[in-house]
């Protein structure tokens, strides 16, 4: 068996066509959505991510607002920049690119974002709304995972999903999305400290690996025909690699590659959150 590739790039391109149509309709109605970014420091990876997001804006037809700050700024300067975007009518939604330099308080910065302008969907208020089933910007990576599985007709209703990783960007909110009535999956949330992880993953219809441990999910941990979504990101020999080993492709029914799987959809749903807010306003 060779697994079907869950192609995030092709799926992203399909979403971009739809988003461009919606952005054009908003412009025709006198509304031009704008995505803002706040980037602190000189981290090459962060700069690459931010460049990609602004390139995406150009493809879809969104305005983009970029605030690049030196690494040695203080907390007050960062907070003032956040306040500026909160008040900027041209900024429909924005993100603070993480990680921040260690001397800055990430939680304070993220909580200062106007929840209605939270393009990442990770503000505590919006995560609380997700728990309550209320309308709010959804976390981009979990939303992308669910969309990608549906795009390839991977059955979610009644499925047992094992999520490996307990971070706030993927693992925790993904469980909330998958257990909504619209998805109706059963979720087991695991992490690097879970005992006998393989016994749990072998029961899973879907495995989502988001622990950041290179090649931790191997073929002997996967039920034949299961779907495996690789979200982990690590560097091995100066190359980006995921949490899923190559031999999994010989056992699984579906595999999302990494890179090229969920990552493009994370960026697509960042723009989706911005456009949706413009449509609601």
From Swiss-Prot:
Catalytic activity, reaction form: (6R)-5,10-methylene-5,6,7,8-tetrahydrofolate + NADP(+) = (6R)-5,10-methenyltetrahydrofolate + NADPH; (6R)-5,10-methenyltetrahydrofolate + H2O = (6R)-10-formyltetrahydrofolate + H(+)
MF (Gene Ontology): methenyltetrahydrofolate cyclohydrolase activity; methylenetetrahydrofolate dehydrogenase (NADP+) activity
Pathway(s) annotated for this protein in UniProt: One-carbon metabolism; tetrahydrofolate interconversion
EC assignment: 1.5.1.5, 3.5.4.9
A Pfam short name: THF_DHG_CYH_C
SUPFAM superfamilies membership: Aminoacid dehydrogenase-like, N-terminal domain, NAD(P)-binding Rossmann-fold domains
Gene Ontology annotations for the cellular component aspect, listed alphabetically: cytosol
Keywords associated with the record: Amino-acid biosynthesis, Histidine biosynthesis, Hydrolase, Methionine biosynthesis, Multifunctional enzyme, NADP, One-carbon metabolism, Oxidoreductase, Purine biosynthesis
CDD domains with a match to the protein in the record: NAD_bind_m-THF_DH_Cyclohyd
Binding residues for NADP(+): 165-167, 192, 233
Domain of life of the source: Bacteria
GO biological process: L-histidine biosynthetic process; methionine biosynthetic process; purine nucleotide biosynthetic process; tetrahydrofolate interconversion
Signal peptide: none
InterPro entries: Aminoacid_DH-like_N_sf, NAD(P)-bd_dom_sf, THF_DH/CycHdrlase, THF_DH/CycHdrlase_cat_dom, THF_DH/CycHdrlase_NAD-bd_dom
Similarity-based family: Belongs to the tetrahydrofolate dehydrogenase/cyclohydrolase family.
PANTHER family named among the record's database cross-references: C-1-TETRAHYDROFOLATE SYNTHASE, CYTOPLASMIC, C-1-TETRAHYDROFOLATE SYNTHASE, CYTOPLASMIC-RELATED
Function: Catalyzes the oxidation of 5,10-methylenetetrahydrofolate to 5,10-methenyltetrahydrofolate and then the hydrolysis of 5,10-methenyltetrahydrofolate to 10-formyltetrahydrofolate.
Assembly notes: Homodimer.
Protein name in UniProt: Bifunctional protein FolD
Organism: Mycobacteroides abscessus (strain ATCC 19977 / DSM 44196 / CCUG 20993 / CIP 104536 / JCM 13569 / NCTC 13031 / TMC 1543 / L948) (Mycobacterium abscessus)
Gene: folD
